[in-house]
């Protein structure tokens, strides 16, 4: 190999070495910039955390929403046995037990509810809707027995009794659960309709069995002994 060729090879080696050194320096510079950026971001986060901690300590701790308190006469809502919320008025409070008695608007039935389970009312419009629906249901229930009872006298709900032959006193019709106030979906309405049908079916089934047993007992008493 000639001296010129050897010189060319030597020059290439120097070029490669210089390139590698330049790349290494560039990588070191990039690494330093990344490290500086990371350290700066960590310092900013630490400063923000210290500032937030100082604000919390200055105000006496983290702020939390105050619980809603109710008193007698306030409107509130609670979850009934059918899993739906209904509007009512607080009629009494037992501080020792942490409970209150809530009277549902329109239905006039009362339920003991934990104070922590009480929820704020949805407003005047929803309360009025519930009241109108309850009264409509009551009118429909009163019109059905009137058509089927014939000459039976009309008595207040609290003293109403169903007497059958033989002197047996039937219990009053069980209270029908309040209907949906328009806030639930179709599934909830179907569920309440099912409960209503179940209540009515159970009452009239018991009424039929009671009449049948009373009739059988009366027939046995009238049969002369041999």
UniProtKB/Swiss-Prot annotation:
Which residue intervals are annotated with compositional bias (Basic and acidic residues) in the record? 35-44
Say which domain of life the source belongs to.
Eukaryota
Q: Which UniProt keywords apply?
A: Cytoplasm, Developmental protein, mRNA processing, mRNA splicing, Nucleus, Spliceosome
User: Is Cytoplasm included in the keywords of this UniProt record?
Assistant: yes
Q: Which SMART domains match?
A: TUDOR (SM00333)
One GO cellular-component annotation of the UniProt record comes to: SmD-containing SMN-Sm protein complex
Signal peptide positions are: none
Designated name of the protein? Survival motor neuron protein
């Amino acid at each position: 190999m000639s001296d010129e060729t050897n010189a060319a090879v030597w020059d290439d080696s120097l070029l490669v070495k210089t390139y590698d050194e330049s790349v290494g320096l560039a990588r070191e510079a990039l690494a330093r910039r990344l490290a500086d950026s990371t350290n700066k971001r960590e310092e900013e986060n630490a400063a923000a955390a210290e500032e937030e901690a100082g604000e919390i300590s200055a105000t006496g701790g983290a702020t939390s929403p105050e619980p809603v308190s109710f008193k007698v006469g306030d409107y509130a809502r609670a979850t009934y046995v059918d899993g739906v919320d209904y509007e009512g008025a607080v009629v009494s409070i037992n501080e020792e037990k942490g409970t209150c008695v809530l009277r549902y608007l329109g239905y006039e039935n009362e339920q003991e509810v934990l104070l922590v389970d009480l929820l704020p009312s949805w407003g005047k419009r929803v309360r009025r809707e519930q009241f109108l629906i309850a009264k409509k249901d009551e009118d429909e229930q009163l019109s059905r027995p009137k058509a089927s009872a014939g000459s039976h006298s009309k008595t207040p709900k609290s003293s109403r009794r169903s007497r059958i032959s033989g002197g047996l006193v039937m219990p009053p019709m069980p209270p029908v659960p309040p209907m949906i106030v328009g806030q639930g979906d179709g599934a909830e309405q179907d569920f309440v309709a099912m409960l209503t049908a179940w209540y009515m079916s159970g009452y009239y089934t018991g009424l039929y069995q009671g009449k049948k047993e009373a009739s059988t007992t009366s027939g046995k008493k009238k049969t002369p002994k041999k």
